[in-house]
C-alpha cells in the first residue's frame, strides 16, 4: 500500500512540474515575441504605432523602482505603451539585446509558476549617441498574457547620461 501511495504522489508531482514547465515555456515564447516586436518597432522607421496591447492583460501594471521610491512606481498599460511610442517620437530608440531567461517561482510555495525572470542588457539611443544599461525583470502572466512586470535598473544613471545628449 505504501508503495502505491508513493508512486501516486511521485507521478502527481511529476505531471504538476511538467505542466508548470509548459506554462513557463509558453509564456517565455510570448515574452520573446514581445521583445522582438519592440526591437523591430524602434528599428523600422515606417512603424508609427506599437501594436503590443494584445500581449498584456487589461489591468497590466509595470512596476519600476527609481531612487527615492522604495515602494516603486506603478505605470498602467496605456501609459507604458504611450511612453514607448513617445520615445520614438523624440527620435529615441531602445534595443533589448543580451538576455538571460529563467523560470520564476511562486512567492509562497517556491515552486515554478509559469512566470519569467529576465536579466538583460539594452541600449537606448538618441541619434548616434548610445547609453548601455543592464536590468532585471520579473514577469507574471495570466492565461498567457503579461499581467505585471517588476523592473530594477539604474534609472538615475541612464537618465543622467541621456540628459547629456539632449542638451
Regions found by a protein language model. Give the residues of each.
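Sec-dependent N-terminal signal peptides
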Residues: 4-15
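Short, low-complexity N-terminal intrinsically disordered segments enriched in polar/charged residues
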Residues: 17-50, 54
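A solvent-exposed, acidic/Ser-Thr-rich amphipathic alpha-helical stretch
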Residues: 50-114
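Short, solvent-exposed coil/turn segments at beta-strand boundaries
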Residues: 52-57, 139-147
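Short, cysteine-centered beta-strand-loop-beta hairpins and adjacent loop/turn segments enriched
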Residues: 69, 123-132
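A short hydrophobic beta-strand element
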Residues: 112-122
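Short, surface-exposed coil-to-beta transition loops
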Residues: 117, 130-137
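Low-complexity, intrinsically disordered terminal/linker segments enriched in charged
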Residues: 148-167
